[in-house]
């Protein structure tokens, strides 16, 4: 047998040197990448554990400032699941009922519609829900005792698995799709139709629409629907859905429609169809919410939700319709914008006012008012008392609610006010929600008295043109106890409140820390009273027809010189050169630890001594590396913190911690139950404690300006008062467990289109800005409160104090031409100076050039939501820059000190950080690779010499 030829030295060395070189280069590259993106790796694989070395003199102090209310993490999880179902149960809105609901328990039903098998649970992006662990629509029905038609369900499931429906791809409209995806009625085969007879107690028809981060729903379905009709949009029923409704009416005596959407839809056709017996809105139910849907259908739960948005008959006639979407200046590269031409007149504020002025026929224009919702029982109301304070006081109205029906239920009482309006004067809506209250569960015949309370000054309007202040004009204000935004409760007359003299709040209102006046004249200047090329017309009640919003013209798309200048990138050197501040002290150790500052006032002098300890590197380490965490600073006893995203619970698509997925924020708002939202905040706080979470990138406080906005599922409502009260309750509940909630996105982040394309410029006049878009944030900042505990002497005495909201997230968009996160008037003057906010602001995800960290810390955005080294400071050494970073650190550290991040820490304790497990794996891999390389080199040397010897001996 011929002996196989041995590889030559030349070939052998070429092969092995190449292999060893590639391994070496790859190993070095991976280690360099890990070093650069260490914070990103930490976010996914873990930051490592921390050990607290107690001060022996304080070993008997109870430093668990916030305690888990359950025995273990499983207890917290089970409580969260129960709360999630409870929120859905109270948020479901019975829109229509011709006496068919509730269905009989144990009824045999047929579920129709793709959405029955392919439901909407949340939204895409940060609002996604793990559907593998979710209770499905079918399971919810079966858990409530219904028998479900298996034949039809299997057909729907198979169709859904092989046919596309709408899919919003984050910040990539070209990759997104907008198919309704409903199965044509031809898909209901002969066998399917034959099966109806065995499951004919009711047809339950599911209609679904989903939203998502980074994209809006489409206002024109051309190209996305094979049966497209001119002007068809995504939020109306398409032909396949209408055919399905017709099929249900043909074969079933009872037809119930489930609206599985957090975006309002055009439902007039269903409401006016006598063959559709009931309509139930369920929003996006989250992880277990479909259990509650089944319970409402069976009568186990009496629905008590109310619509958080108005439901117009024709969205294309809405004043926001033409000014939503993709518009850009022709003379600015990346100059995208949106005109809020409607001002304060959007949602129910427009429809109620336009009807009062005779501009529209309300019954034709509106399907369901804001605040609408039916029940399985009846209620009567009566005024039990009223206390009408003076203009510096409060209005309180007591209403006794009695269940006059035969089953237990809850009711919602709504207080609106109608302010006197002078044609051509300050713009005013015909009605505005002032307060609301929800009863407890009232048994048949049972009564409860609820109190509706609001400050008189809350009825003031903001006059951005003349007084440049809030103004409570003289005249008679009507206080209206209503079922919804349109209908007075039977037998309850309006209450008159007389303001004898106009009050102009030049010194601010009672809740303002400084006088309030115009801060956004660079935006206001673009608004005019009549139509002019290049300007925005104020939509006025004085002439709805003549000032009705129109789409931007070519002239409007030519930016003025001032607007062009506003888009010029931030120049830190130029701005800082104008500053005359002195270089602050750095690196001066005083022995203080962060725990020593817990409980101290924000402006306590000890903070300055403490901050003197920081080095510039400390400041850069924290402020430029804030994605989903803040960094540990052992030198000052600052622990690392963990912050998670997810608008409906800690369910972020970034990181490896996932908790309960709650129903969408719209469902939360639709409960009209602030007490429930506080309890939900407490339960969320327990989940946070069980999972070592310190902060939450939520709740979302933006408004439903347009039903087409992709992130409406993340935001509560069109109404700022409802949003503010619901949000404040949730924030306070979370704070009771030491969790700081980042109310977001501050501010005017009401569409997704072009959000990251250099920041879409939102042009909104200051009246609408303050009364509508800033109002939910203002209510939460001024009202949120929770008791905290701390030690303040050497004896271990426990002190308590109240602390408010301590975290805010800014937004991608611009206010006018200025990036919101870099707007000093927005981030400092309004937020901190006027409202008194104490805490820190984090940017939205900071990957884009227009979001400059220097501009952020100058304006009051303290932490950059990004991973090192994605962003850097233009100027990190000047006195102005260091002062700005020091202020940012003050804000960040104040929030941290007064949070659950300090659990286990007392004065004198030390923090030891343990290396994360993944780092040991990396070290082990490096050692193994190193040994392999050494062995490889030795083998090459040995083999080469041996081969030479063999050749020499031949």
Residues covered by each model-derived region:
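Short beta-strand elements
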Residues: 488-511
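Extracellular/periplasmic metallocenter environments
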Residues: 468
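Glycoside hydrolase catalytic-domain context in secreted enzymes
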Residues: 1-464, 473-487, 511-954
């Amino acid at each position: 047998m011929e002996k196989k030829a041995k590889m030559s030295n030349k070939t052998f060395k070429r092969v092995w040197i190449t292999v060893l070189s590639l391994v070496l280069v790859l190993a070095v590259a991976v280690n360099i990448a890990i070093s650069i993106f260490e914070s990103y790796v930490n976010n996914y694989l873990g930051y490592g554990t921390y050990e607290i070395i107690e001060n022996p003199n304080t070993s008997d102090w109870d430093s668990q400032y916030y305690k888990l209310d359950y025995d273990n993490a499983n207890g917290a999880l089970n409580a969260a699941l129960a709360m999630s179902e409870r929120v859905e149960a109270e948020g479901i809105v019975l829109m229509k009922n011709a006496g068919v609901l509730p269905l009989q328990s144990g009824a045999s039903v047929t579920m129709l519609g793709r959405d029955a098998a392919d439901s909407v649970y949340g939204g895409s992006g940060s609002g996604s829900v793990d559907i593998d662990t979710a209770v499905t629509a079918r399971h919810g029905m079966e858990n409530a005792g219904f028998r479900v038609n298996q034949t039809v369900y299997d057909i729907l499931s198979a169709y859904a698995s092989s046919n596309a429906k709408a899919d919003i791809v984050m910040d990539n409209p070209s990759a997104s799709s907008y198919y309704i995806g409903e199965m044509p009625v031809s898909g209901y085969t002969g066998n399917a139709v034959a099966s109806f007879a065995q499951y004919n107690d009711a047809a339950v028809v599911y209609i679904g629409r989903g939203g998502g981060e980074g994209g809006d729903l489409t206002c024109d379905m051309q190209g996305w629907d094979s049966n497209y009709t001119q002007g068809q949009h995504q939020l109306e029923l398409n032909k396949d859905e209408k055919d399905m409704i017709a099929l249900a009416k043909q074969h079933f005596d009872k037809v119930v429609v489930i609206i599985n959407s957090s975006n309002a839809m055009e439902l007039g056709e269903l409401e006016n169809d006598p063959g559709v017996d009931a309509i139930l809105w369920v929003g996006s139910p989250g992880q277990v919410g479909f259990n509650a849907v089944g319970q409402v259908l069976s009568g186990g739960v009496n629905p008590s939700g109310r619509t958080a948005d108005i439901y117009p008959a024709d969205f294309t006639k809405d004043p926001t319709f033409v000014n939503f979407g993709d518009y850009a200046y022709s003379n600015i590269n990346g100059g995208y914008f949106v005109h809020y031409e409607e001002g304060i007149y959007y949602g129910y504020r427009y429809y109620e006012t336009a009807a009062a002025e005779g501009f529209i026929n309300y019954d034709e224009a509106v399907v369901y008012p804001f605040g609408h919702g039916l029940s399985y029982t009846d209620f009567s109301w009566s005024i039990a008392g009223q206390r009408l304070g003076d203009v510096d006081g409060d209005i309180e109205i007591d209403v006794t609610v009695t269940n006059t029906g035969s089953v237990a239920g809850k009711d919602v009482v709504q207080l609106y006010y109608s302010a006197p309006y002078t044609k051509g004067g300050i713009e005013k809506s015909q009605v505005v929600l002032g307060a609301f209250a929800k009863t407890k569960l009232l048994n048949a015949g049972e009564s409860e008295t609820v109190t509706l309370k609001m400050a008189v000054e809350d009825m003031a309007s903001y006059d951005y043109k003349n007084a440049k202040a809030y103004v409570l004009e003289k005249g008679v204000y009507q206080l209206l106890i209503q079922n919804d935004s349109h209908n007075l409760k039977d037998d309850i007359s309006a209450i008159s409140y007389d303001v004898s003299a106009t009050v102009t709040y030049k010194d601010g209102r009672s809740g303002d820390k400084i006088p309030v006046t115009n801060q956004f004249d660079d935006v206001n200047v673009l608004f005019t009273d009549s139509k002019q090329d290049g300007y925005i017309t104020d939509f006025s009640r004085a002439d709805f027809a003549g000032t009705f919003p129109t789409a931007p013209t070519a002239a409007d798309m030519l930016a003025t010189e001032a607007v062009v200048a506003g888009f010029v990138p931030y120049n830190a050197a130029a701005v800082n050169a104008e500053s005359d501040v002195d270089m602050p002290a750095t690196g001066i150790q005083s022995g203080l630890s962060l725990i020593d500052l817990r409980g101290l006032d924000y402006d306590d002098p000890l903070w300055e001594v403490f901050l003197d300890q920081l080095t510039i590197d400390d400041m850069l380490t924290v402020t430029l590396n804030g994605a989903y965490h803040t960094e540990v600073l052992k030198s000052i006893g600052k622990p690392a913190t963990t912050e998670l995203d997810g608008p409906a619970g800690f369910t972020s698509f970034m990181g490896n911690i996932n908790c309960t997925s709650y129903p969408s924020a719209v469902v939360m708002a639709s409960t009209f139950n602030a007490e429930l939202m506080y309890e939900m905040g407490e339960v969320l706080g327990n989940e946070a404690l069980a999972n070592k979470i310190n902060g939450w990138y939520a709740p979302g406080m933006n408004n439903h300006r347009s039903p087409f906005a992709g992130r409406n599922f993340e935001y509560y409502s069109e109404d700022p008062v409802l949003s503010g009260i619901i949000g404040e309750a949730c924030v306070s509940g979370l704070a009771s467990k030491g969790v700081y909630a980042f109310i977001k996105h501050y501010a005017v982040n009401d569409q997704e289109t072009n959000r990251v394309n250099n920041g879409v410029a939102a042009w909104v006049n200051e009246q609408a800005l303050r009364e509508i878009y800033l109002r939910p944030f203002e209510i939460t900042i001024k009202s949120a409160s929770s008791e905290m505990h701390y030690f303040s002497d050497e004896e271990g005495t426990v002190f308590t104090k109240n602390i408010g909201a301590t975290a805010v997230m800014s937004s991608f968009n611009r206010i006018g031409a200025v990036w919101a996160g870099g707007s000093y008037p927005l981030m400092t003057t309004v937020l901190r100076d006027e409202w008194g906010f104490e805490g820190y602001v984090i940017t939205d995800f900071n990957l884009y050039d227009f979001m400059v960290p220097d501009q952020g810390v100058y304006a009051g955005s303290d932490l950059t939501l990004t991973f090192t080294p994605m962003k850097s400071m233009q100027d990190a050494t000047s006195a102005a820059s260091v002062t700005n970073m020091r202020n940012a650190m003050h804000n960040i550290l104040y929030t941290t000190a007064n949070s659950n991040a300090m659990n286990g820490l007392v004065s004198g304790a030390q923090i030891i950080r343990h290396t994360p497990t993944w780092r040991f794996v990396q070290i082990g891999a490096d050692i193994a690779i190193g040994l392999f390389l050494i062995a490889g080199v030795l083998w090459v040397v040995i083999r080469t010499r041996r081969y030479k010897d063999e050749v020499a001996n031949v």
